[in-house]
Amino acid sequence: MPLFMDVHQSLPTGTKAKDVAGAHAADVKTQDKYGVKYLKYWVDEKAGKVFCLVDAPTAEAAAKVHKEAHGLVADEIYPVSEGS
């Protein structure tokens, strides 16, 4: 399946890494319904940004998981290739 990196540019004020961990857990509970697998995420609390690496059939399928799981949809989703 293709890999995508989604970018959340502006999280709600005061969002912490533990909040993102909870959202990720909700993604994991929802992902099978859409044939998606959220692999990793990175949080920049200071900048209010989150980056999620996802294995998904389409960018739209990845977005549907976020929307259903917690409503925090990404601002941008990029197709990416893994390097060494």
Where are these regions (language model features)?
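Short S/T/G/P-rich N-terminal loop/turn motif that feeds into the first structured element of a domain
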Residues: 1-33, 37-39, 43-48, 65, ...
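An amphipathic, aromatic/His-enriched active-site/gating alpha helix that lines ligand/cofactor pockets
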Residues: 55-84
